[in-house]
Amino acid sequence: MPLTQDRKQELIGTYQVHETDTGSPEVQVAMLSDRINQLTEHLRSHPKDFSSRRGLLKLIGRRKQLLAYLAANEADRYRALVDRLGLRR
């Protein structure tokens, strides 16, 4: 199930870097993490849903790329984001 508009606005408001920010790496990673958590819960109850599993792996790869970009260019923002999201990195 995709993110609702209200949930997206909530995530943007929480993780935005400046007032009009909607596409910074922090916001993108937060949205991907929320979607990843939803898909993980879905797959716990539907373990044979392989198309959703493939989508989950694609989302994880995209989040990994964005986190690598942040780690390489803005290490302090990267560490703050990982702490706020509770990721194991």
Curated annotation (Swiss-Prot):
One of its GO terms (cellular component) is cytosolic small ribosomal subunit. One of its GO terms (biological process) is translation. It comes from the Bacteria. Keywords: Ribonucleoprotein, Ribosomal protein, RNA-binding, rRNA-binding. One of its GO terms (molecular function) is structural constituent of ribosome. One of the primary rRNA binding proteins, it binds directly to 16S rRNA where it helps nucleate assembly of the platform of the 30S subunit by binding and bridging several RNA helices of the 16S rRNA. Forms an intersubunit bridge (bridge B4) with the 23S rRNA of the 50S subunit in the ribosome. Belongs to the universal ribosomal protein uS15 family. Part of the 30S ribosomal subunit. Forms a bridge to the 50S subunit in the 70S ribosome, contacting the 23S rRNA. NCBIfam families: S15_bact (TIGR00952). PANTHER family: RIBOSOMAL PROTEIN S15, BACTERIAL AND ORGANELLAR (PTHR23321), SMALL RIBOSOMAL SUBUNIT PROTEIN US15M (PTHR23321:SF26). This is Small ribosomal subunit protein uS15. The gene is rpsO.
